[in-house]
Amino acid sequence: MLSKQIPLGIYEKALPAGECWLERLQLAKMLGFDFVEMSVDETDDRLSRLDWSREQRLALVNAIVETGVRVPSMCLSAHRRFPLGSEDDAVRAQGLEIMRKAIQFAQDVGIRVIQLAGYDVYYQEANNETRRRFRDGLKESVEMASRAQVTLAMEIMDYPLMNSISKALGYAHYLNNPWFQLYPDIGNLSAWDNDVQMELQAGIGHIVAVHVKDTKPGVFKNVPFGEGVVDFERCFETLKQSGYCGPYLIEMWSETAEDPAAEVAKARDWVKARMAKAGMVEAA
């Protein structure tokens, strides 16, 4: 049985696609998860959630209450399309407006943590000016988040600007704000030439959640668990020994699979077995 001190969640994109959150949370509960992480990506469909009516927001809150499965975090990857570091003022303004709406949405439905994508720009060429604009955009975003009491947490990315906890800590020190923290992805962290254990230890005190996935160098998505380079047992041991007691989120993109629930159940069992070996949970 999963320890109550270690919440285990599943990414929305691992579960069947659709807009019925009651069904999604019921399935997550059946699969043994404590929470689901919402995705607001660069697609128009998921971006439109930020414009939900009061009734739509209330339906999500009611689904959470009915199922007991929380939605405590949002993966906000929409800034790939509307980056805060864009040299196009109109695009950057859209990025800041998305941030404002996301923070308001989080405040309305009880989301505590918004995971940020650490891209100054994604589809354009980066330079000193895009990085400066990105820093300024983060500063403005954290000011908004502070007023709303919503935490912004930087993901460790598949992108050189933010591919280590050490680099993300630089932004945390620059912003010097308790509402800006870190949300490492042990898959992304392992795919680069990082000393993963040292990086995880360096982040303790700033880590608010952890993404769990497997990766290979240069391959950051859809690597089956056990086929990549991540030393899960060592990562879990390091986090446990360092005093981290927060949530873990299995990140998968199986929403279009033939049987998403079966894929998720298989991954859940695999991850929990590694957690048990690390002394984090009881063996199944």
UniProtKB/Swiss-Prot annotation:
Keywords: Isomerase. It holds the Pfam family AP_endonuc_2. Induction: Induced by L-ascorbate. Repressed by UlaR. The keyword Heme does not apply. One of its GO terms (biological process) is L-ascorbic acid catabolic process. Gene3D superfamilies: Divalent-metal-dependent TIM barrel enzymes (3.20.20.150). Its EC number is 5.1.3.22. It catalyses: L-ribulose 5-phosphate = L-xylulose 5-phosphate. InterPro entries: L-Ru-5P_3-Epase (IPR004560), L-Ru-5P_3-Epase_Enterobacteria (IPR023492), Sugar_Epim/Isomerase (IPR050417), Xyl_isomerase-like_sf (IPR036237), Xyl_isomerase-like_TIM-brl (IPR013022). GO terms for molecular function: intramolecular oxidoreductase activity, interconverting aldoses and ketoses; L-ribulose-5-phosphate 3-epimerase activity. Pathway: Cofactor degradation; L-ascorbate degradation; D-xylulose 5-phosphate from L-ascorbate: step 3/4. Catalyzes the isomerization of L-xylulose-5-phosphate to L-ribulose-5-phosphate. Is involved in the anaerobic L-ascorbate utilization. Belongs to the L-ribulose-5-phosphate 3-epimerase family. This is L-ribulose-5-phosphate 3-epimerase UlaE. It comes from Escherichia coli O8 (strain IAI1). The gene is ulaE.
